[in-house]
Amino acid sequence: MLIKVATFNLFQFCSNNYSFYTKKDRFTKSDWEEKKSWIKKQLLKMDCDIVGFQEVFSQDELKELCLELGFKDFVVVQTPKLEEKNQVFKSTTVALASKFPIKNIEKVETKDSFSFAREPIKASIKLDNDLEIVVYVAHLKSNRLNEFEYRFTKDSTLEEKKSKLDIALKNNYSLSLKQRLNEAKTLHFDIKKQKSASILLCDLNDREHSITIDALTNRRFYIKELLKDDLVLFDSYDFAPRKVYNPHPEFKGFKRTPTSYFIGKGNTLDFIFVNRFLKDKIKDFKVFDEHLQKNQNGSLTTSDHAQVVCEIEV
C-alpha cells in the first residue's frame, strides 16, 4: 500500500483568545479564521495520511480542525507554557495527526538532565495492512538570537565540519547550536534502535548540509574509525524519483525547492527522513510552496514555511 506523510510548520498556530510570546502579538478573530481556512485548504491539497505539525500553541483547535478533515487520531505530548495573567503563550509544541490508529506513544529517551526545547513525539501507528510503523515528529532548537554558526556546502567533509564545530563549541559561539546538536544526537540513538520502518517528520532549524544532519543521521559522526558514511536515517528527497517534463536543452539538473527564506535566500529547513526499511520505497516527494512564491516571508495567516509531502510504499 501507499501512504503519504508530511511535515507542516504552522507558523504561530495560536487562537485569537491568546497572545504568543508577547501580549501585543495576537490574531484578530478574522485573521484567525482566515489562517484556519488556509490550513484546511492546504491539508486537503496535500491529501496526506499522517502529518507532523510544528509551532502549535492552540492544541484543541488544531485537533478539531484535523478531525473535521477525516484524521482519526491526534496526539500531543507536551502543553505550551502559558503566562496566565496576560494569557500569553511562551512556548510551542509539536503535534501528530493520523488517518490510521495511533497504537502507542513513547517518550524519546534522554540522558542525564538533558531535555528537548520542544518535546518530540514518538508514535507507533498501525496501517491497514497490519504493518506497524514508528513516526517521530520534531522541531529542533532555532537560532533565534542569530548567533554565529558555520555554514557548509555539499563539498564540505565531515572532518572539516567537526573541526569547525569543535571551535564553535569551545568558544561558545552558539548555545542554540549546542542544544540543537544534543537534540539531533538524542533522536539519532533512539531511532537507531528501531527494528522496523521509521519516519522522522521535522523542522530541523538547520540547513541541508549542516553538521546537525550528520549528528542526526550518520554513525561516522560518532565513530571516527569508520572510513565511510554509515547512515541510520536517509533524506527522502535523495531517494524520490525525479520528474522532468519537456526538459529545456540547457537543463542543468534539479535544484532543491527551499522550504523557508531569510533575507531573500532560500533554505531547506523542513525534512522527512526514513530509516533503512523505507529508503528504497520512496515513490514521490513534493514541496507545497505556492504561498512562498507569492511572498517569500509568508504571512501569519498562512505560514512562513513550505510543506513537505512524501509518498511511501509500505
Residue ranges and their predicted role:
Residues M1-K72, Q78-T92, K161, K185, ...:
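N-terminal, active-site-proximal structural segment of metallo-dependent hydrolase catalytic domains
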Residues L2-Y18, D130-T157:
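Short, solvent-exposed beta-strand-terminating loops
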Residues F8-L10, I39-K63, A123, V135, ...:
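Active-site beta-strand/loop signature of hydrolases that rely on acidic residues for catalysis
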Residues N16-S19, K63-E64, K107-E109, N146-F148, ...:
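Short, solvent-exposed loop/turn and secondary-structure capping segments
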Residues F20, K164-K170:
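Short glycine/proline-rich turn/loop motifs
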Residues I50-G52, V56-L145:
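Structured beta-strand-rich core segments of catalytic domains in phosphoester-bond hydrolases
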Residues K107, S115-F116, S124-K126, F189-I199, ...:
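Metal-dependent phosphoester-hydrolase catalytic domains
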Residues A168-K178:
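Surface-exposed cleft-lining segments at the edges of enzyme active sites
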